């Protein structure tokens, strides 16, 4: 860590690796959840970028037109880790965390209710069934979803750079059409946490 330079690392990553006055390892990678959205549709509808619960709800109301276009594809498969990641991202964005420095945290009733109501809204704008990362990526890549929450691992696929998961918005598996119509948000804000936050691993 010292050879690479302390200033080349985020403080949070160094804190996680700290042990007995030194570092147990070198933090080498990490990722967060992103709101991936169709910027072309947002621009055409005059919608704000979806960086808050309110902006996402407004976009769902404007763009949800199933089966051609779903406003969102949110994970609903409760035994799939992806749903836990997305739900925790949504919780943290509203200042809700099940843990604190002392262990388990008491959940704030108002903020938690806001989280659950918001999650219900995005689930209601999703296709029916048990959904997880696979369906959200497939629907977005087919041009049938206005928004999803996904990790940065989707970015190379979105650009047509991964043969096993190509965009299907047109007949060219290496097409960058969808990438050119997409933008991402890294920090989401809820009504009880206007500064926003994000889940990270």
Question: Can you name each region flagged by the protein language model?
Answer:
Residues 60-62, 101-130, 181-183, 187:
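Glycine-centered hinge/linker elements that transmit conformational signals in sensory
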Residues 39-40, 47, 61-68, 92-96, ...:
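Sec-exported extracytoplasmic/periplasmic mature domains
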Residues 44-45, 121-127, 166-201:
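Extracytoplasmic/periplasmic substrate-recognition and gating elements
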Residues 15-28, 33, 55-104, 111, ...:
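Extracytoplasmic/periplasmic solute-binding protein
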Residues 1-32, 83, 174-188, 193-196:
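Hinge/lid segment of periplasmic solute-binding proteins
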Residues 1-9, 40-51, 146-147, 157, ...:
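Extracytoplasmic "Venus flytrap"/periplasmic binding protein-like
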Residues 53-57, 128-141:
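Short helix-initiation/N-cap motifs at beta->coil->alpha
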Residues 133, 150-155, 187-188:
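Beta->alpha turn/N-cap motifs
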């Amino acid at each position: 860590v010292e050879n690479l330079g302390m200033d080349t690392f985020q403080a949070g990553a160094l804190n996680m690796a700290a042990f007995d006055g030194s570092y147990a390892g070198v933090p080498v990678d990490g990722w967060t959840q992103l709101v991936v959205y169709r910027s072309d549709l947002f621009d055409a509808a005059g919608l704000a970028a979806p960086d808050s619960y309110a902006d996402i709800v407004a976009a769902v109301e404007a763009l949800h037109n199933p089966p051609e276009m779903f406003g969102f594809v949110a994970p609903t498969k409760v035994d799939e880790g992806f749903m836990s990641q997305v739900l925790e991202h949504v919780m943290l964005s509203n200042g809700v965390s099940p843990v604190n420095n002392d262990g388990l945290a008491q959940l704030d009733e108002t903020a938690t209710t806001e989280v659950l109501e918001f999650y219900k809204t995005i689930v209601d704008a999703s296709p029916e069934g048990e959904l997880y990362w696979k369906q959200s990526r497939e629907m977005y890549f087919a041009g049938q979803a206005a928004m999803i929450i996904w990790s940065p691992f989707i970015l190379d696929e979105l650009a047509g750079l991964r043969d096993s998961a190509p965009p299907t918005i047109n007949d060219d598996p290496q097409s960058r059409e969808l990438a050119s119509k997409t933008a991402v948000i890294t920090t989401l804000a809820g009504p009880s946490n206007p500064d926003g936050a994000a889940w990270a691993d």
